[in-house]
Each structure stands twice: as C-alpha cells, then as structure tokens.
C-alpha cells in the first residue's frame, strides 16, 4: 500500500490500525440478536458468492480488473445507495471500481475517521463457483463439507473453531476459497454504515469508507483517490481485514515484493557445454533453495519475518532464449530484519550467477506494498482505539 501510506504520512494522520496481524489489543465484545445475525449472514453470503479474485502480474504499472471485481463493486454500490437513500451521505464508484462513502459530520469538534476494506479476493486458490455453507449453532465437532473435506477443531486449520461453539460458522464447500478475506470486512462496513445512518442520536465527525481493489496483489493504494475522503486527511484510519473479532492490530508486517527473472539460451542437453546452455528452470530452483528454511513462512511465528518465493512461471521469450520468473515476498516487522532478508536475497542471486554462469539474472526494483504502521503510530493512540471501539 505504498501510495496510501505516503498519502497518510503526508496528510499527518494520527494513526492507521490494521485489523490483520499478530500485535493486537482487545476491545469489548458485543452480543447481537438473531435478526441481526441473519441479516449479516445473508449479506456476507451474497458477497462471498461473487468471484472477485484478482489477477497477479509482474507489470507493476498494470491494474488488472476481472469481471467479478467489477460486479462486486457494483453490488456494494447498489446496497449502499439503497441504505443511504434520503440521507446526506454520498456514494461514489470510481473508474478503478473503488467504492467511496462519505457521511458528513453532524456535530463540531469530533475527529474524522476513515474505515477501509477490500473487494477483491486472493488469486492463489480456486475461486470460481463459490458455494458458502452456513453452519448454524455450531456444536464444537468436526465440520463435514460437501466436497468431502473435514474441518476439525483439533487440526491447525480448524483451531479457531473452539471459540465458535454455539455460533454461526460459514465455510466454503471445501473446493474453493470462501473469500472471507475480505468479504467479511465489506459486510461489516456496509452494516456499520447502515447502523450509523439509522442512529439519529449518534454525534460524529466526518466518516469516510473506502472499498478498494487489488489489495491481495499488493496494489490497493495504486488507484486510491484522496479527493473522495476529504483530501486524504482523516484523523484516524481503521482497516477491517483479518484478525479475530474485537482485536485491533497496532503493528503489522512491512510487505515488500520483488520479481527475479532467469534468462538463458536454449540448447540440446547433449551439446549443453559447447552451446553455453542456460538452464533457467534449474537456476531458478537453485535460487529458491538458497533461502534458509528458517526464513520460510512456515517457520515464522509472531513478529518473525520471512521470505516467500510464491510463484515460478515460464515466460515466453524469443531469439533462442528461455526465461523463468520467480516472484518473491518479504515480510518483516523490524527494519533491521528487513535488511537481513535483503542480504539473503542478494546472496542467493550472486550464488546463481556463480553456479550457473550461462544464466542471466534480472531483478526488478523492490515494490513497497505496505508498511508497518507502528513506525509512525503514536503509542498513546492504542487506548483511544479501544475506547472508540467500545
């Protein structure tokens, strides 16, 4: 979220809290009646059924939008127009399919706030023909999904079920992603907008809402338009994306992306030495293998950073050359650890050049996707956030 972070810093915002990552503070939980639960469930299911998966690309100037992403934006826009009809609030859908809402202040001297969620879903799992399955009054046992998959509270994947006994649990049918990241956030914000505008007694400053696109490919900030949110200068920004209910994260991973391309000449293996064969597949695999297992995401706990080589893709080339592209994520809380991870990647690149001299390595510049909000958030704000949540 590089540009958004820049906008936030330039505007001198008080804070940005990401509800997504390990460092959390806890606000008071609330109980809701069956009517509210049913309404929220229906809204979420309707959103989850829309396949709004993004499409990742190494072209950092591109901003791909799939038909489902456009459909999701139009659905949220239509729901909000119905909710806000007859009020002073405004709804705007931009050319980039972001949806913006402004609820004007009805009292003076109250800080402004902006809430955010994203409309897209990760492209890294099957996402077509999503079938949400609603499990009401969960009894604490195994969930048997239509695909044959069993979700058990005794497994790492189902460990959160232990806190859901007696509640409504929603899953996919087991053959696709559900898309709760971030259809949950979208559902929460649309419901919040409904609550605010129906509560005539609530006194508030300007309240803004942003439903962004392509967050899951690290580009939510690329088409963010500050003109729709008071010039980009609300006093507090809260992103609804990920963590457990009532948890507010006040620190998060800094996210950096980079792409490495391995290029070499094609040749028959029997004539590889004389022809200076550049085996790009093996070179790319060698590069990935240079990253210490201790720095793999599966070894990361809490605030430990990691390097994730998450795709390896052949690329069409000409002039008798072949190419393989490896996309890499770096995640870290501490800036010094980030420097250590960069050194590891640089060493891995150098080792490929030594081991496979016929392969050319081309690395794109780093792309800062979003930054740890703790770098710029005043510590005094944590209790303010809790107080606001209550």
PLM features: residue spans?
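Acidic/His- and Gly-rich active-site-bordering loop/insert found
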Residues: 28-168
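Phosphate/diphosphate-binding glycine-rich loops and adjacent basic-rich segments that engage nucleotide
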Residues: 239-267, 272, 281-282
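Metal-dependent amide/peptide-bond hydrolase catalytic core
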Residues: 279-390
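Buried hydrophobic packing segments
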Residues: 76, 80, 188-196, 284-288
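Bacterial N-terminal signal peptides that target proteins for export
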Residues: 2-12
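Acidic/histidine-rich catalytic neighborhood of metal-dependent amide-processing enzymes
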Residues: 161-253, 299-318, 326-333
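C-terminal segment of classical bacterial N-terminal signal peptides
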Residues: 18-26
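A generic structural motif
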Residues: 176, 266-269, 273, 330-338
